Amino acid sequence: MGLCSDPAITYLKRLGYNVVRLPREGIQPLHLLGQQRGTVEYLGSLEKLITQPPSEPPAITRDQAAAGINGQKTENLSFSIGINILKSVLAQFGAGAGIEAQYNQARKVRFEFSNVLADSVEPLAVGQFLKMAEVDADNPVLKQYVLGNGRLYVITQVIKSNEFTVAAEKSGGGSIQLDVPEIQKVVGGKLKVEASVSSQSTVTYKGEKQLVFGFKCFEIGVKNGEITLFASQPGAIAMALDAAGGVMPSDSALLDEGGLLDLEGF
């Protein structure tokens, strides 16, 4: 959805991550997404598709350090796009009303996420769980997204952060002077606001919530009459986990080739 040349987005996509346009809580491994007619919708947890689970769901490993993603920056975004992302992020912390007035001199905005953590589940474990489980064949989600015209995906990893830095520029690249104490008043006590030592136009926001800004997912489909997990190259299914639980390639599915992904239903 635009911004496809942005190096940060391209970098995350190259690692197999879908980049969430409006970072938020609530996106977790083992949650399902349905894609139909260009829209991606949140559908709920994988367990709701299972009538008789063979065992406990695959274990989720939480709060792993994501050093390879930490500190990645977007390129300069237009003010209208950048300020909407900032307002959405701040709203997740219960703050941000009126923040656009503090950036009224800005024409470009750039984001950087720090303290990035990952929650993940092993795709092979998910595939094995699906193979052994009894799936609800009458579930409308299965009929619509697996047997119908849609596509069904299960999230296997999310990347999240509670700290992000916003750099603002005037038209032509000049810096602006941001009033950090005033910004702190606007966001209240739910976020800590700090100015960069090197630039008054760069501000870091830090809160307690971990907001998800990217995720990996694999497609759920049917092979030889059985529900199974597929690994997808961007835009096409590459291969499936075989009945013996063989090796699965690492390529996860990219749901939007254009850039940032909008999720419906959260």
From Swiss-Prot:
Note the effect listed for F111A.
Pore-forming domain still toxic in E.coli
Q: Which domain of life is it from?
A: Bacteria
Q: What is the effect of changing L15A?
A: Pore-forming domain still toxic in E.coli. Complete loss of toxicity of pore-forming domain in E.coli
Q: Output the PTM entry.
A: Palmitoylation helps stabilize the inactive state; may self palmitoylate. Palmitoylation plays a significant role in pore formation.
Annotated region (C-terminal region), positions in chain: 238-266
What effect is documented for mutating C4A?
A: Complete loss of toxicity of pore-forming domain in E.coli, significant reduction in leakiness of liposomes
Effect annotated for changing L211A: 100-fold reduction in toxicity of pore-forming domain in E.coli
Lipid attachment locations (S-palmitoyl cysteine): C4
Supply the alphabetized keyword list: Antiviral defense, Cell inner membrane, Cell membrane, Cytoplasm, Lipoprotein, Membrane, Palmitate, Transmembrane, Transmembrane beta strand
- Regions crossing the membrane: 69-85, 97-114, 163-180, 189-205
GO BP annotations, alphabetical order: defense response to virus
Gene Ontology CC: cytoplasm; plasma membrane
* Result of altering L77A: Pore-forming domain still toxic in E.coli
Regarding protein family, the annotation reads: Belongs to the bacterial gasdermin family.
Q: What is known of its domains?
A: The N-terminus has marked structural similarity to the mammalian gasdermin N-terminal domain. The C-terminal region wraps around the twisted beta sheet core, probably stabilizing the inactive state. The beta-stranded transmembrane 'fingers' of the active protein form by local refolding of several alpha helices found only in the inactive state. Reorientation of the N-terminus probably flips the palmitoyl moiety for insertion into the membrane.
Q: What is this protein called?
A: Gasdermin bGSDM
Organism classification: Bacteria, Pseudomonadati, Myxococcota, Myxococcia, Myxococcales
